[in-house]
Amino acid sequence: MAERHEGADWIAVDWGAEGFRAWAMSAGGEVLATAAGASGVTGPEAHEAALLSVATPWLGPGRTPVVICGDAGGRGGWAETPWRPVPCTPLAERTIPAPDGDPRLDVHLIPGIKQDNPADFMRGEETRIAGFLSRDPAFDGVVCLPGLHTKWAHVSAGEIVSFQTFLSGELAGLLVEHSSLRPSLAAMQDDADAFDTGVGDALSRP
């Protein structure tokens, strides 16, 4: 359910495989309202309908820019965008215009990033790296992006140099929900010390 906030200056959307999140934004970058919706749709018409189901309260009388990252730019998404090869800056100089049937929407997609060796790709995570670099533009090192498919990205001189994906989150979910370990894992409590140790090991040997 979207918060009611008419007249957002623009809308940001992160479209994942299992759902999407949307933010009503001011011209100065302030988050005015947030919403989330279900995914599992294909084609521009279905994506537009899904977005309108949560973002309609934010639309004014004119055209509202909508900037979308993630799976909406993949095959079967709103529109397929070309890949950008590494090394490259997290964000392209230009977004990709997407078809929109509602006259209140002006939709643009952020292209994803690919790597040939080893073969890998990201759609959506590049925007998080861009956000991190906006706060620390001189950063040189490895950025970890936890999630269903965790990504580790080597960043240097404002560019993504290389990256690698691990199915950490998905494997953990499968073990907890569907494996023979389910009864014992369900009873486990969070262990902050073990977490800190794991983070320390990862930082020392990225």
Predicted feature descriptions by range:
Residues 56-122:
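Short beta-strand-loop/turn "lid" adjacent to the catalytic site in phosphate-handling enzymes
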Residues 7-8, 63, 104, 138-140:
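A general structural motif
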Residues 10-14, 65-67, 141-145:
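Short glycine-aspartate micro-motif
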